[in-house]
């Protein structure tokens, strides 16, 4: 008779061990998932910012073929609703749809273009990659994710305004002002659409430290210089970026 030894071992877990294991997995997930999500948001912002910059400036070049040097394009004029006497009501600004359509949107692939609400100068262009551009009469705001687009209503005036807390994270400010010859505009003069650099002194510190529009947590206006800071770093969000995604 030959004996057969069974060397296999039955491994059993107690309920307490299972719960402890699940608890550890839960803690690890709670620590890592927010980081993974933040990293994903950063990557989306980087990719779409660079793509938008390339796409909109290709549009500028194509428009120059049709309309000549961009510094000679007809000026962008503010548009207003008319009052009962047929005069401009300066409290009710409208988007200059014709300007943006003529020089930019005609040369860009969009899913939808529409004014935002009533009594606002905002014209929204939804792009195929899931982003949205707000062509305002003063500047251009780019939202890497269209779902993040949101405006606030000023309680005092009833006017729509930017949600400043989202600037530099959920939206980024650009400017098109190629004909401005003043010294403060030197980084936009004879340039296409650039990250907002009006009044910039040319240094990284200048982008970070401006109390009104610097890329830092506390500012009096919006963090308009953040896109320029990312551009300076090769369209990658710097490791020491002052805002959390």
PLM ranges: what are they?
Residues 72-77, 82, 86:
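Juxtamembrane "stalk/linker" segments
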Residues 60, 81, 108-112:
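Amphipathic alpha-helical interaction segments
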Residues 57-76:
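Alpha-helix exit/C-cap motif
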Residues 8-41:
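N-terminal single-pass transmembrane signal-anchor helix
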Residues 87-245:
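Intrinsically disordered, low-complexity regions enriched in Pro/Ser/Thr/Gly and acidic residues
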């Amino acid at each position: 008779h030959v004996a057969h030894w069974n060397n296999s071992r039955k491994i059993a877990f107690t309920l307490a061990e299972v719960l402890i294991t699940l608890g550890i997995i839960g803690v690890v997930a709670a620590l890592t998932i927010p980081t993974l999500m933040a990293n994903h948001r950063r990557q989306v912002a980087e990719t779409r910012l660079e793509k938008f910059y390339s796409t909109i400036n290709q549009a500028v070049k194509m428009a120059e073929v049709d309309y000549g040097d961009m510094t000679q394009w007809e000026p962008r004029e503010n548009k207003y609703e008319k009052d009962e006497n047929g005069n401009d009501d300066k409290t009710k600004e409208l988007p200059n749809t014709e300007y943006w359509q003529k020089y930019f949107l005609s040369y860009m692939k969009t899913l939808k273009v529409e004014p935002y609400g009533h009594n606002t100068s905002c014209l929204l262009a939804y792009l195929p990659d899931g982003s949205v551009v707000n062509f305002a009469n003063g500047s251009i705001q780019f939202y890497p994710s269209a779902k993040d687009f949101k405006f606030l209503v000023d309680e005092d005036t009833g006017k729509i305004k930017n949600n400043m807390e989202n600037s530099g994270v959920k939206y980024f400010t650009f400017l098109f002002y190629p004909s401005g010859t003043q010294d403060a505009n030197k980084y936009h003069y004879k340039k296409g659409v650039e990250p907002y650099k009006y009044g910039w002194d040319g240094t990284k510190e200048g982008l970070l430290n401006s109390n009104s529009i610097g890329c830092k947590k506390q500012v009096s206006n919006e963090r308009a210089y953040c896109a320029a800071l990312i551009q300076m770093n090769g369209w990658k969000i710097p490791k020491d970026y002052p805002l959390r995604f």
